[in-house]
Amino acid sequence: MLIGSHVSMNGKKMLQGSAEEAHRLNEKTFMIYTGAPQNTRRKAIEDLNIEAGHEAMKEYGLSNIVVHAPYIINIANTQKPHVFELGVDFLQKEIERTEAIGAKDIVLHPGSHVGAGSEAGIKKIIEGLNEVLTNDNDVRIALETMAGKGSEVGRTFEELAQIIEGVNHNERLSICFDTCHTHDAGYKVKDDFDSVLEEFDNVIGLDRIKVLHVNDSKNEIGAHKDRHENIGFGHIGFDALNYIVHHEVFENIPKILETPFVGEDKKNKRPPYKHEIEMLETETFNPNMKEIIMSE
């Protein structure tokens, strides 16, 4: 199964270290930020250790890796021109890094309209993406399905479709389908996932989905909260998520876990990914997973 998680990329090893971390977690793919998601500090492309990273990926059988754009990008902002301009400029540079790393998709939160209304936010996102998607490369921007927290744009399939329809080079737009976000937005991810896919296909088209974020949710359906939970421990539940990751629609799509680290002590939190992947690959839920992780 083409499944992995968000892994770190830092120090001198950079991409090579990401591949090694993913391998230790028994992953077949992984997702990275090119730097801290909260700021714009980035290393030069030549310092990302890409060649050694690719060699490690080949050795460990890792493929279809994904980049995630930082949270600070908000091209839906109609109130502050400098925030919009920073977002456009930084997204262009992130696409260059994504191409150099060899990833096909960079996941982007569409943005927040900060009070101007979703229609105004969508117009601004379209403006920004039309500025960004002019340089000639193969990198796709994967718009993420959002939970609808605050003034987030992208809480419905229709909002995402509006963005896609307004962008000139929309062959370079894809979708990152997030199970937690879509559940929190009010879609029946737990109880009737095939109808959700059917609706998505009618509004956007299943061929647009190029990344799957696999997360349980701490919240009831429609809560608009966006709080991830470990696989099988939330309101979506193991059976539904297991069904989703084994669904034929996602067979060749990278499936990325973004579930929380385990442990009460903030200084001793541990990644759950190896165990969550094992549960999904064996299709068997282990209610003692968290205790097992902390006892290792």
UniProtKB/Swiss-Prot annotation:
InterPro entries, per the entry: AP_endonuc_2 (IPR001719), AP_endonuc_F2_Zn_BS (IPR018246), Xyl_isomerase-like_sf (IPR036237), Xyl_isomerase-like_TIM-brl (IPR013022)
Binding site for Zn(2+) 1: H68, H109, E144
The keyword 4Fe-4S is assigned to this record: no
Catalytic activity: Endonucleolytic cleavage to 5'-phosphooligonucleotide end-products
Record key words, sorted: DNA damage, DNA repair, Endonuclease, Hydrolase, Metal-binding, Nuclease, Zinc
Any GO MF annotation of the entry: zinc ion binding
The protein's role, per its UniProt record: Endonuclease IV plays a role in DNA repair. It cleaves phosphodiester bonds at apurinic or apyrimidinic (AP) sites, generating a 3'-hydroxyl group and a 5'-terminal sugar phosphate.
Enzyme Commission number(s) from the entry: 3.1.21.2
Underlying gene: nfo
Domain of life: Bacteria
Family, as annotated: Belongs to the AP endonuclease 2 family.
Top enzyme category: hydrolase
Native source organism of the sequence: Staphylococcus carnosus (strain TM300)
Binding sites annotated in the UniProt record for Zn(2+) 2: E144, D178, H213, E258
Cofactor requirements of the protein: Zn(2+)
Record text on cofactor binding: Binds 3 Zn(2+) ions.
GO biological process: base-excision repair
Protein name according to UniProt: Probable endonuclease 4
Binding site for Zn(2+) 3: H181, D226, H228
PROSITE patterns: AP_NUCLEASE_F2_1 (PS00729), AP_NUCLEASE_F2_2 (PS00730), AP_NUCLEASE_F2_3 (PS00731), AP_NUCLEASE_F2_4 (PS51432)
